[in-house]
Amino acid sequence: SNKQLNFLQHIYRSLKNNGKARAAVVLPDNVLFADGDGEKIRRDLLDKCNLHTILRLPTGIFYAQGVKTNVLFFTRGKTDKGNTKEVWIYDLRNDMPSFGKTNPLKPEHFDDFIACYADGDLSKRKETYSEENPNGRWRKFSIQDILARDKTSLDITWMKTESDTDNYTFAELLDQIKEKSQNIAKAVSELEQLIGEVEE
């Protein structure tokens, strides 16, 4: 929603541009892929800050069951342009058990991420993803990869599991249908406009 996007924008713009001020923010998935203002804010964040890490959290641990969240780790640059060179993403969501009251998320579930994170020292990081290990949870994407994505989406997945299609709640499926319907309606509207111009 706009509130969440504004919240993110407020945080990174409030950081001192000294190359040291940093933040880690928990945000729902839609902030990673919302179009319009969402894309503008993501591009601004990638410019003004070094968005070096995204941790994809298991479903339903912060909000209502079914809501997907992420932690964005970033450092404000000294300039306002070109601060992000690469984004490292750790997928703690795919192929993980469902967490809740009966199966709480524990500190040890973060052990591998903490080791991969390497205290934020990018030079010490090593991907666990490779062509030989396509389900490695830790993967690096260049800024060119990110900017080339539709709407500069940061909602990136690569791990494939047999249960991928079974993990959606009814509400999530409705959200997906709604989003796809909006995209289709927009495309139809643009097509109608184009046809109208041709016929004129």
Q: What do the predicted segments below correspond to?
A:
Residues 1-200:
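A conserved structural/catalytic subdomain of Rossmann-like adenosyl-cofactor enzymes
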